[in-house]
Amino acid sequence: MQQRMDIWVSKVFQVLVAAVLGFLLLLSVFSSTTVLVQQNLNGDVKVSNVFSRDHSILRIGFILIFGGLLLLVRHCLRRTKRKIQSDAWITVAYVIFLLAGLFFIMSVRLEPRSDPEKVMNVARQILAGDHSSFVDQEGYMFRYPFQNGLVLLDVALLSVFGQNAYLAFQVLNLLAVLVIAEMLGRISEKGYLSHSIGNAVRIFVILQPVTFLYMTYLYGTLLSLACILFAIYSAICYTEKGQWRDFLVCSVASSVAVILKSNSMIPMISMLLFLLWTCSAENKLRKIQNIGLVFGIFAACVLGRKGINFLTEFLSGAPTPAGMPKMNWIAMGLSGDGTYNGVSVNIFRESGFDTAASIADAWANIKGSLKYFWEHKGYFIKWFLEKNALQWNDPSFGCIQINRLRGDAYWGNCFFQELLYGQLGNGLWRLLNNVQSVVLFGAFYYWSSRGQKTKKAYILGVAALGGFLFHCFWEAGSQYIMPYYLMLLPYAVEGWHVLCSRRK
């Protein structure tokens, strides 16, 4: 009975993830999305999404050429397999990446803009004794009190590093990328029982221009992703050995991840589902341990949030506001093209900044959107395709956009300007467009193949599935999708490995 249930659950998840990846692969092969950021003479910034058809024959050809080269390289290096698997290569790669990242950060010195700048300004206000952002109805923290974890991090960095706090944050992001690479590698080893696959994933992550350029984005994205991946790895280790160290690390890392970025709740839920699924097939003691870890994660998240709120209230002298309800983001996500358009804030403002009244107004707005979709099904299909295209089909995932209009680099200005605005940036975007298709093809092949998969191998895939479903309703943005794209890299590596192994 238990075995039947496990087979049924695994098949359902496999079909759903494969279907989503197949859809995204088709989007990638036949179309692409670019983000244009323009600034007029008054300093106003306009962001627009441009949808274009891809040369599908060239995209398919690139996938085939990549597969052929992979087969050739695999054949040529078969005799040097031990060297490829050597951890020394990974250490060297990490050191090179660390030095390159430090050089990049200290060279370009890009200060934060947009929301990261607003969060850091709130931190500066707290240190200056100005707490208006928490009490003024138009204040940033009055609307978004869940950002207080990020604010406290900025407060700590400003207290230690002063005006160079933004550089310290970028160094933390650099270290976070290394943690992400290592955790994805270790999770891959647990899921596929292959050290060589884990090393390939590590190299693939640090070679991604997306992760490199995201180091300047001071919004907690990389730090939160590093923490939740650390939590997932610790959860897997706990199910194997039941050590209290893994219990504590998993609970604390989950709490920190959600505090820094609430979107990390999606991979956290995937991890919780894994724990519940695993305990159904284990012995009685292991069931108790797994369920205990689930409660431990919940407790850590609740206590962590309360602790952050308490510390913020202590520093600001103002109670934590209820803030803008999450329902407002859904209302905004279902209006227009689904990107940020001010609908969420307007609903909050028009309801008199009353959270309960804003929920009712947002729900009315949501029902209106759903009714319109039902009555105009052709429009809904177009809207659904375009919303997912602008999120998942920008191969740069906003890594170029987030670095634009942030002042001139202090060193290597011509190179950096060419990367962001010139032909070098266009070439990078085209390369990433091809790489994205290769990644999605490998991941799709893995999930559509009939080979038996361990329960551990489902965690990141279910997290990506959750991210896809969540952002069908939530505010759209390719920068929100970037973490899920990185979670697909292990499946891409394993998928291509399986495919090449069958073509010996």
Regions found by a protein language model. Give the residues of each.
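Start-transfer (signal-anchor) and selected internal transmembrane alpha helices
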Residues: M1-F103, Q289-A299
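Transmembrane-helix motifs of polytopic, lipid-linked glycan transferases
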Residues: V171-Y192, F230, G442-Y446
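Transmembrane-helix signature of polytopic, membrane-embedded enzymes
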Residues: L184-L207, K455-L460
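Short acidic/glycine- and proline-prone juxtamembrane loop motifs at membrane-interface regions
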Residues: V210-S224
